[in-house]
Design a protein with these regions (language model features):
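Non-catalytic, topology-defining segments of multipass membrane proteins
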Residues: 1-99, 155-183
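Juxtamembrane C-terminal module of membrane proteins
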Residues: 124, 139-142, 159, 170
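Transmembrane alpha-helical segments that form the membrane-embedded catalytic/substrate-channel core
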Residues: 6-10, 99-123
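Short, surface-exposed loop/helix-turn segments at secondary-structure junctions
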Residues: 123-129
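Short hydrophobic "helix-edge" motifs at membrane interfaces and signal-peptide entry regions
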Residues: 90, 106-108, 139-141
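Membrane-embedded alpha-helical segments that form the functional core of polytopic membrane enzymes
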Residues: 1-8, 103, 133-144
Length: 183
């Protein structure tokens, strides 16, 4: 996402997600979960357009400067794409920028938006996201398999999610949180 959104835009969208998790009309990350299963591979790329439509269309920018910065980045991105194609470097752009962006965005959307919140059936604090305990996933996803910890205590740094999960497991389980693969 770093190539397509500014930090203020991401911060705004992420804050809105935390304040309205799994609420279809507001949560910007719900779009991938609501898509038909056969379209999900395409919808894994939905942040490219849904974040913008909500950021611009619903006035989520915190300041005019934040909005202008995103507009400048969007214009620069489109201009760069057009320039690459016009100068015969479309294939280079595809191989060096577009394919890596699509693959990384699909993985990030799957790991951060879809899997942690599936089945999108609750807006309750302890039920709107889950933890998927796994040492391997902890390494590959930089702790986001413990996304439940991120939602409950968003000031905890990602590298402590697993530790906090272990320390709070009994309390989380008692509260009915989705703390295991089968929940």
């Amino acid at each position: 996402m770093a190539l397509t959104v500014t930090l203020p835009m991401f911060r705004s969208v992420h804050t809105k997600h935390h304040s309205s998790t799994n609420r279809p009309e507001v949560d910007p990350d719900m779009d991938v979960g609501r898509s038909p299963g056969w379209l999900r591979p395409v919808w894994l790329l939905s942040p490219l357009w849904t974040y913008r439509s909500r950021y611009y269309g619903q006035g989520w920018a915190r300041t005019d400067a934040d909005r202008r910065a995103q507009v400048v980045l969007d214009i620069a991105t489109v201009s760069g794409i057009l320039a690459a194609v016009a100068t015969g470097h479309g294939l280079d752009l595809l191989v060096v920028v577009v394919v890596p962006l699509v693959l990384s965005l699909a993985l990030l959307t799957l790991a951060f938006d879809y899997v942690p919140h599936w089945p999108y059936d609750s807006t309750e604090r302890f039920h709107d996201t889950r933890a998927l305990p796994s040492r391997a996933l902890n390494v590959v996803l930089l702790g986001q398999n413990y996304h439940l910890v991120h939602h409950l205590w968003n000031t905890v740094p990602w590298y402590r999610y697993q530790q906090v999960y272990r320390e709070t497991y009994d309390g989380l389980a008692a509260a009915g949180a989705r703390v295991d693969w089968g929940d």
